[in-house]
Amino acid sequence: MKSVKELNKKEMQQINGGAISYGNGVYCNKEKCWVNKAENKQAITGIVIGGWASSLAGMGH
């Protein structure tokens, strides 16, 4: 080995068989991209709830 780097937890979570995780259920490697539907659904739900909560907070002004 020429060099070794200790990975932190976030970096370890992004390793998926040489693919890059974009944190929303989308993964890409050199050949293709794909979606993990369970992760994607959770990410979209979080975005929707966050937007809904922000709009409610803004209604009080």
Curated annotation (Swiss-Prot):
<keyword id="KW-0044">Antibiotic</keyword>
<keyword id="KW-1015">Disulfide bond</keyword>
<dbReference type="InterPro" id="IPR002633">
    <property type="entry name" value="Bacteriocin_IIa"/>
</dbReference>
<feature type="disulfide bond">
    <location>
        <begin position="28"/>
        <end position="33"/>
    </location>
</feature>
<keyword id="KW-0964">Secreted</keyword>
<dbReference type="GO" id="GO:0001897">
    <property type="term" value="P:symbiont-mediated cytolysis of host cell"/>
</dbReference>
<dbReference type="InterPro" id="IPR023388">
    <property type="entry name" value="Bacteriocin_IIa_dom_sf"/>
</dbReference>
<comment type="similarity">
    <text>Belongs to the bacteriocin class IIA/YGNGV family.</text>
</comment>
<feature type="propeptide">
    <location>
        <begin position="1"/>
        <end position="18"/>
    </location>
</feature>
<dbReference type="InterPro" id="IPR023384">
    <property type="entry name" value="Bacteriocin_IIa_CS"/>
</dbReference>
<keyword id="KW-0929">Antimicrobial</keyword>
<dbReference type="GO" id="GO:0005576">
    <property type="term" value="C:extracellular region"/>
</dbReference>
<protein>
    <recommendedName>
        <fullName>Bacteriocin carnobacteriocin BM1</fullName>
    </recommendedName>
</protein>
<dbReference type="GO" id="GO:0042742">
    <property type="term" value="P:defense response to bacterium"/>
</dbReference>
<dbReference type="InterPro" id="IPR010133">
    <property type="entry name" value="Bacteriocin_signal_seq"/>
</dbReference>
<keyword id="KW-0078">Bacteriocin</keyword>
<comment type="function">
    <text>Has antibacterial activity against Listeria and Enterococcus.</text>
</comment>
<dbReference type="Pfam" id="PF01721">
    <property type="entry name" value="Bacteriocin_II"/>
</dbReference>
